[in-house]
Amino acid sequence: MKLLKILLFLLILPTQNLFSSPYLMDPMPNKKPAPDFVLVGIDGKEHSLTELRGKFALINFWATWCTPCKAEMPTLESIHNTLKNDDFTVVGIHVGPGPDAINNYLSLNPVTFPIFIDMDLEYDWGVPGLPTTFLVSPKGEMLYRAVGKRDFS
């Protein structure tokens, strides 16, 4: 019986993406304001959501220990390089161990978008798991959310 359960699991596992959203990101049911924050970036300076007002912000919650997060990073860098201007930015919010782990990872996998360090903001934002990405409007409203690895390129 145990073998049968394992075989069923292995047969179903490859189809899990068939039941996920057909869209890159899912619309938020109500465009509530994104919770504000003041976080320290890997640049050592404090940053807030308020300073991103006036532009679309793709905010990605990730961690260096999260394999899907690391696989997603090059696509975030790609969309950042394609769309970066006064109206759009990508921000990475690292959840978990501090600057040393982040800097070690980024030394081998550099990105040009800002990375902020968080210890508990994911609860305010309703992050169910990593990676989770939000698209925030220029007015600070949460428009879309993607849970799990995506290809943003």
Residue spans of the language-model regions?
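N-terminal "domain-start" segment that seeds a small globular fold
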Residues: 20-49
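Cleavable N-terminal signal peptides
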Residues: 7, 18-19
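Sec-dependent signal peptide recognition
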Residues: 2-9
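Short, internal strand/loop/helix patches
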Residues: 91, 103-139
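Non-catalytic, surface beta->alpha helical segment in thiol-disulfide oxidoreductase systems
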Residues: 138-153
